Amino acid sequence: MGNKRPHQDTESSGHGFENAARKRLRTNRPHKPKPAAVDLDSLSAIKKRARAIERLLTRDNLKIPANKQGDLERELAAHKRRIEDARMKKDRSHMIHKYHMVRFFERKKAMRFAKQLEKKVAQATDPEEVAQLKADLHVAQVDIDYAIYFPFMEPYISLYAAAAAGEKEEINKAVLYLRTPRPPMWTVVEKTREDGQAALERLQNRRPQTDSSLEATQQPVQDDVAGKQHSAKKGRKGAQQPGAKTSKPEPNQKKGQARKPKDKEEESDDGGFFEED
């Protein structure tokens, strides 16, 4: 007859099997990740909230109090401003990276020219030569600020690209670079320098002009030119046909039909003006 195991041994072994089974169950269970906290300040969350408000406000059967609707409209405007600021920040970073090298090299070149001209001004004795050197020194100093404070959000226009293409002699390099035509922004930087550092920084960080503002500035010029052309045509027609009579529409004709020949004549005149030789 075999010996029986003590009660303590059987109990301890049973607990061991139970713990192992629990471990297997724990490891086999699928892991449920905790839901990530929603960042309400993130750009994606702001865009999602703005789209939700727009969809709500564009409903035909919208029935919410007027004060609640006003709050939603103000919230939507604030979200759109934040989205636009984020887009402008991204575009600004892209433009800075794109034109970083050319701005850096032109700034270094302008600083080198300014240093050379300062030495020449200190050594020169002829008044005419001193005046010319000072003028060149002023151009070099403006070139430095141009390379630094050119608006970040606008395509950079190089100062020395045309001069470098026509460079022949090393001796006249500074003269060749400093006496070439400058882009329009150079004059803006030159005038802004008089208002101080803060004005230059505002110019550097200004936002690009929109197409509507450009059209508004160009529209008066186009209207003036069109008015002059119309008056000139009218004067030529009056001089060529002083006694011409105006044709009246027949009774059976409509008002629009009587004006057709005149419209065709004006269209032919305008087309002839824009034709190339």
Curated annotation (Swiss-Prot):
Compartments it resides in: Nucleus, Nucleolus
Coiled coil start-end: 66-126
Gene Ontology process terms (BP): maturation of SSU-rRNA from tricistronic rRNA transcript (SSU-rRNA, 5.8S rRNA, LSU-rRNA)
Biased composition (Polar residues): 206-221
Chief location: nucleus
Region annotation Disordered: where it falls in the sequence: 1-38, 204-277
Gene Ontology annotations for the cellular component aspect, listed alphabetically: nucleolus; preribosome, small subunit precursor
Biased composition (Basic residues): 22-34
Compositionally biased region (Acidic residues): 266-277
Biased composition (Basic and acidic residues): 1-12
Family matches, as InterPro entries: Efg1 (IPR019310), EFG1_rRNA-proc (IPR050786)
Pfam families (alphabetical): Efg1
Keyword list, A-Z: Coiled coil, Nucleus, rRNA processing
Summary of the function given for this chain in its UniProt record: Involved in rRNA processing.
PANTHER family: RRNA-PROCESSING PROTEIN EFG1
UniProt record similarity statement: Belongs to the EFG1 family.
Protein name per Swiss-Prot or TrEMBL: rRNA-processing protein EFG1
Gene: EFG1
